[in-house]
Amino acid sequence: MNYSTIQTFDDTKLVKTICTQKSADKNDGVWKYGEDGALQNYEELGRLFGVSTSDIVHVKQTHTAEVRIVTKKDGGEEILRPESVSGYDGMITNEKRLLLCTLQADCVPLFFLDPFQQVIGMIHSGWKGTANQIGVNAVRLMKEEFGCRPSDILTAMGPCICGDCYEVGEELLEPFGVFYSEEERKCFFHKREKEGKYLLDLPEAITISLLREGVKKENITKPFSCTLHDGIFASYRKEKDPVARMLTGIMLI
């Protein structure tokens, strides 16, 4: 299994992270519950992190802005069995040796860590989740349930499609108008010469919302790779593969 890590997080010695890369073996990108080869991949992932598949959890992901708290009893969801509740795209926990995972193929994986309260989060943020502030919802849940201070929270964005590659239609302007001002939208929507087309910078939109919520600029790590033009990580826009995904994960150690 080829992978990268979020170095700023792993350097804390509090967590281990992972962002799986593409490989010649197409089965390496199979992670969804019930798909052929998925369980074997999770078993290999577990060996890498020193845990069993019953200590790994991820949500089904339906492009919501909802985040849930997970515990050891949720381990194995969407791996050994379907998830017990639906409608969530992110997870928060303070339990050690519970590996939180999300799947992406251009969307933004959001990693959270409060090194003081030792709380982590793993979030899938596509354009819908970003427009509806899923990152902010994660910060608020960490604050409300675990006493985390936004100024203490470290945030990192894993590989995703970058603002120079993500072309969208003008119909996305309206959804982003609910939580973002017109001036803010100008920072991450850039009009193209083609009629009705824009370049959308999801990492910048996420950064703006997190700064508003009290996360410090120096505690936000931007993506180190574009899934579309770097060719290292799964990209639906590039490959049109309905199965292949990048798995991203974080675990308190």
Model-identified regions with their sequence ranges:
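Active-site microenvironment for binding and transforming phosphate-containing groups
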Residues: 1-253
